[in-house]
Amino acid sequence: MSKFTFKILWLENNIAIAIDYNIGNNKSPLTSYFFWPRNDAWEELKIELESKPWINKNEKVDLLNKTTEIINFWQEKEKNTSLRKAKEKFPEFNFIGTN
């Protein structure tokens, strides 16, 4: 089981990304939601992760890489990328949203 879970709000004009920390069978919010393209979600998440010294560098890089992947995938939505396709591509993420 991964130590972290992504929560994604899949909206028509924005995507919002938050991360939970998994503790056993429970989850604890690690971050608030960061929006793209309204704000620079990637940069805001990077700053938030840097403020948590207990997360090792490799985990931070992995979380930021996954953030890049989901943002890039969302940006392709104009090419008929749907919420259903996002759920298929990222089954480990928790999605809420509209198409």
From Swiss-Prot:
Main localization is plastid
GO cellular component terms attached to this protein's record: chloroplast; ribonucleoprotein complex; ribosome
- GO MF: structural constituent of ribosome
The cellular location(s) given in this protein's UniProt record come to:
Plastid, Chloroplast
GO BP annotations listed: translation
| Entries under InterPro entries matching the protein | PSRP-3/Ycf65_sf, Ribosomal_PSRP3/Ycf65
What keywords tag this UniProt record?
A: Chloroplast, Plastid, Ribonucleoprotein, Ribosomal protein
Q: How does it assemble?
A: Part of the 30S ribosomal subunit.
Listed HAMAP family: Ribosomal_plastid_cS23
Q: Which family does it belong to?
A: Belongs to the chloroplast-specific ribosomal protein cS23 family.
The function of this protein is: Probably a ribosomal protein or a ribosome-associated protein.
The protein, known as: Small ribosomal subunit protein cS23
Q: Which organism is it from?
A: Gracilaria tenuistipitata var. liui
Q: Quote the gene name from the UniProt entry.
A: ycf65
